[in-house]
């Protein structure tokens, strides 16, 4: 048993006990020839990790020679006692500027002199004493010492300080700066997290500001570049009926600076509808539509098909029409950009132009407005929900002369379905739905919508050119 203990002691010392000074020449010869040196200076307090290292090294050694003979241990102690361990280079700390120079320790103060000497002695006597408990006890004992007891340690510390000053004349104490890694990391993670979470919110905010909030009169419609921005795959089916828009309200509120900047630079926000769920867009639009007053909305919706209120169209009604049409999953009516605007032409040429326009820009199904000789500058894509065309007639420029060649009513051909006129607002809450269904009166709207006398020139001349 004693031989096993000494084996662990000798093995432990080169592996690296905390204090290499315990291998000094004065302490090494105390190992007796019989291997049972009780007061051996090589004994340190082995922690559980160090014991594991020792056992692993024993297993890695020769399997048949479990115990080293006495002559081997004596040779090891003789070699270790003759070696000056101060010549071993210290590990270089990767500390910025001090990569080339080895780290120089501070000279020990009086307490460190006492603690090191007492730790060595106590570790010899009580090898299983835990290092932390040992440190606590040494600190308590040092505070209980009087001045006469502390004097030898103070003198030794002073001697060490003078020696240190001679050895390192240009020594300067440079404590390692404590890196605030966690705080900096937390600050660095915050913006990244915002952008990750705000990705979908930014898209929805671009959409919202494009259609409802940020309408400049000099800008064209964001959908006025002549090609529908919906992929045709999404335009086929009916829209996804949204649930109660609670979370979309918060996620849609991105910072207005971002929206204003993108609209100011680009002029037209580019929305990748391939990545946006139609259901989310419907939530967003319908949750923002609650800000519209019902009475304000009624002045944009002609209740009996009479277009007398067309002159009072504003930016809100314009944005509302395109937002409603997009929310239903279908392309809204698309007005041509200002550069393509043609002067008023004779009815045959206009008829040919309108036929080409309506059939080419409507890939989703059969065009609804194939008999429009009057759409000189306005092309309709196919609308599966035809009440949008009747609810929001597309007035974008005042120079269209509709009184010259106006047929009996292609625009209000669907206005007879006044009950379908308000089905767009079925996305609203049930508390708001009766406000719209009460207005629908299908009896007067049918005959009035087909009379050509309602298309009068002053309605369009009162509009200012955008």
From Swiss-Prot:
Region of interest (Transactivation domain (TAC)), ranges: 353-466
Region (Disordered): 1-67, 160-198, 213-275, 355-375, 433-466
PANTHER family, alphabetized: SOX100B, TRANSCRIPTION FACTOR SOX-10
InterPro entries: HMG_box_dom (IPR009071), HMG_box_dom_sf (IPR036910), Sox_N (IPR022151), SOX_TF (IPR050917)
Organism, scientific name: Rattus norvegicus
Domain remark from Swiss-Prot or TrEMBL: The transactivation domains TAM and TAC (for transactivation domain in the middle and at the C-terminus, respectively) are required to contact transcriptional coactivators and basal transcriptional machinery components and thereby induce gene transactivation.
UniProt region (Transactivation domain (TAM)), positions on chain: 228-310
Record keywords: Activator, Cytoplasm, DNA-binding, Membrane, Mitochondrion, Mitochondrion outer membrane, Nucleus, Phosphoprotein, Transcription, Transcription regulation
Principal place of residence: cytoplasm
One family name in Pfam for this protein: Sox_N
Tissue-specific expression: Predominant expression in glial cells of the nervous system.
Nucleus in keyword set: yes
Modified residues (Phosphoserine): 24
Name of the molecule in the record: Transcription factor SOX-10
Stored SUPFAM superfamilies: HMG-box (SSF47095)
Residues covered by region (Dimerization (DIM)): 62-102
Gene expressing this chain: Sox10
Listed Low complexity bias regions: 23-32
Gene3D superfamilies in the record: High mobility group box domain
């Amino acid at each position: 048993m004693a031989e096993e203990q000494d084996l662990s002691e000798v093995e432990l010392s080169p592996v690296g006990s905390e204090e290499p000074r315990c291998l000094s020449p004065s302490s090494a010869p105390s190992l007796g020839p019989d291997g049972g040196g009780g007061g051996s200076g090589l004994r340190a307090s082995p922690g559980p990790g160090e014991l594991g290292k020792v056992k692993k090294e024993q297993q890695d050694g020769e399997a048949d020679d479990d115990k080293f003979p006495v002559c081997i241990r004596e040779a090891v102690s003789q070699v270790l006692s003759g070696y000056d361990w101060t010549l071993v280079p210290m590990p270089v700390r990767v500390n910025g500027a001090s990569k080339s120079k080895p780290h120089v320790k501070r000279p020990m103060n009086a307490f460190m002199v006492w603690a090191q000497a007492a730790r060595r002695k106590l570790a010899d006597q009580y090898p299983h004493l835990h290092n932390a408990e040992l440190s606590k006890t040494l600190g308590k004992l040092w505070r209980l010492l009087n001045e006469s007891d502390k004097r030898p340690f103070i003198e030794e510390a002073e001697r060490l300080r003078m020696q240190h000053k001679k050895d390192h004349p240009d020594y300067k104490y440079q404590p390692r700066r404590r890196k605030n890694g966690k705080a900096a990391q937390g600050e660095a993670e915050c913006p990244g997290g915002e952008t990750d979470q705000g990705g979908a919110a930014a898209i929805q905010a671009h959409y919202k500001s494009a259609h409802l909030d940020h309408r400049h009169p000099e800008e064209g419609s964001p959908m006025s570049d002549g090609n529908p921005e919906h992929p045709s795959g999404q335009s086929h089916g009916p829209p996804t009926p949204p649930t109660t828009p609670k979370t979309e309200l918060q996620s849609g509120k991105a910072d207005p600076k971002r929206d204003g900047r993108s609209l100011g630079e680009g002029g037209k926000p580019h929305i990748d509808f391939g990545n946006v769920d139609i259901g989310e867009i419907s939530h967003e639009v319908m949750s923002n539509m609650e800000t519209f007053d019902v009475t304000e909305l009624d002045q944009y919706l002609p209740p009996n098909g009479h277009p007398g209120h067309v002159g009072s169209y504003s930016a809100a009604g314009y944005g509302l029409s395109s937002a409603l049409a997009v929310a239903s999953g279908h392309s809204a009516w698309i007005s041509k950009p200002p550069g393509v605007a043609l002067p008023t032409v004779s009815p045959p040429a206009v008829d040919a132009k309108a036929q080409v326009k309506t059939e080419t820009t409507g890939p989703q199904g059969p065009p609804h407005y194939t008999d429009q000789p009057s759409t000189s500058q306005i092309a309709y894509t196919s609308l599966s929900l035809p009440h949008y065309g009747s609810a929001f007639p597309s007035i974008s420029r005042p120079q269209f002369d509709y009184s010259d060649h106006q047929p009996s009513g292609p625009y209000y051909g669907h206005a007879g379905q006044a009950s379908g006129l308000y089905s767009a607002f079925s996305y609203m809450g049930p508390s708001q739905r009766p406000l719209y269904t009460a207005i629908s009166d299908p009896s007067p709207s049918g005959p009035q919508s087909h009379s050509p006398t309602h298309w009068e020139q002053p309605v369009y001349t009162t509009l200012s050119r955008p």
